[in-house]
Amino acid sequence: MDEDQGPAQIVPGTTPKKTIGDRVRGAKRALFTKDGLVGTYDYAFLFRPNLPFMRKSRQNSPFFGLNDQMPTLLALLLGFQHALGMLAGVITPPILMSGAAGANLTTSQQQYLVSTALIVSGFLSMIQITRFHIYKTNYYIGTGLLSVAGISFSIIPVAQGALSQMYANGFCPSDADGNRLPCPEGYGAILGTSAITALTIVLISFLPPKIMLKIFPPIVTGPTVLLIGVKLIESGFKNWMGGSGPCASPSTAVGFFASCPNIAAPHALPWGSPEYFGLGLSVFVAIIAAERFGSPIMKSCAVIIGLLVGCIIAAAAGYFDRSGIDAAPAVSFVWVKTFPLSLYGPLVLPLIAVYIICATEAIGDITATCDVSRLEVEGHTYESRIQGGVLADGINGILAALMTITPVTTFAQNNGIIALTRCANRSAGYCCCFFLIIMGIFSKFAASLIAIPSSVLGGMTTFLFAAVAVSGMAIINKGVVFNRRSRFILTAGFVFGYGGILLTGYFDNVLKYDGDNKGLHDADAAEVASVNDRAILQGDDSARTTSEDAQPVTQEGLKGEEKLH
């Protein structure tokens, strides 16, 4: 099947009006007839591997437009495929920001955040897919496309930089030896500030898309996304080699943390051990194999397949700790655990920058979704989808923070699934939301994800973070003409962008403050946004971190260290 072939005409983008009777008859057909349940789709195509000696199918599968009728079984199957394609991207940010290099939350809190991230992504994706008209206006909320929402990667370096500052100035607690203790207050400060700064993207959404792109051109957003990806690759590799907590630093890898994640963990080894490298490499190789030789459904969830292969090897070798899985509750939901919301001043400007990045990325993602869905990519309908999608991202950012999750944005990787399966139908999108919510409710699933060894998770996240960097390159390549002026602007911006990544502490003593204001200690907002703001400096000239250890440093862990001595 050639996924690039399809109907020459643009399929209708408007939703046909249906009476209650039409909906009842449609439901009966979908649930109680063979044609409505199964249809005539070539299901074998989804599972047919791409092996060199196998004959390729020459028969084109049908293209399911936005509002076309499609078999119920196919909608469920493709929805599950979309959910698997999103899974790695949804769970990675909460794992990173709640672990040893982030807020160092307890294992139960980490499990809750992973479960909630899946639930929130499912509910907020429904807003994008449904598309609501704002009464007596020309504005909409949502795209009305198969646009799914997941946790933004752009927040990770900003949040981790802010948390490091909070530990340094005493906002977050540390023990007598300087080891980080759980800091739910710090995570709550990120959420509270995120909810307020999300209003930025709400205001931006009422600007025409052309003006948005002129204010934030690709020469600004492309390098920003690229630098975020490069910064995250560094931390992904750190986890690949064993972890990102105290065990990763020679100065702190002593006593209880002489091995990663600590000496009490099963099969603990020193950071950088060849066994850890091999575990991460098994994930990386499995991802490549699934992408090269896998069936369409395997290709769309290659990252999850790689993670599964790594988990099987790690479990067989005795790297898994089941205690967290056994202790986890059977089910979970939003607000089972809460965090004290607050406004943290140094985070305001960096988070505004993050939301600006999310808005510009959303424009590109929605345009790509329209393209693969065989819908207009210009004109009033297209512009209203852009406006509705960006506005939904802003509203979703506020709702996500109130539901204890960091900013949510549209996901681009699902566009590849639409092109591959030739299905842009919203029914598959709603099924995707259903599966995400179910995965989140059953918290044993989240607990098993938290228990994954850091080296296995690092092999997966390094691949994802490299994809973020490549996305930044693609933005630059598509939207920037490489003349002398643009090269000069990029060069000037990359001086501080790459410099700050390679030498992270260069700014530590530039803005020293010795007063009583904790928000001004050691650094200001510009330092917290060490990656984002340096890239955005290019815009002034021109006008998706770490995988946390599964066992955070808690009071119980420190008591265990004392017993060992």
How would you label these PLM feature ranges?
Residues 2-146, 169, 180, 521-523, ...:
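N-terminal alpha-helical transmembrane segments of multi-pass membrane transport
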Residues 81-82, 119-129, 157-162, 197-205, ...:
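Hydrophobic core segments of alpha-helical transmembrane domains in multi-pass membrane transport
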Residues 2-46, 105-114, 214, 271-272, ...:
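Flexible hinge motifs at transmembrane-helix junctions and intramembrane kinks/re-entrant loops
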Residues 73-278, 455, 459-460, 472-476, ...:
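Early transmembrane hairpin of solute transport permeases
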Residues 63-71, 338-346, 382-383:
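Helix-boundary and loop/linker segments of multi-pass membrane transporters
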Residues 72, 98-142, 350-426:
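Membrane-embedded helical hairpins/re-entrant loop segments and their flanking transmembrane helices
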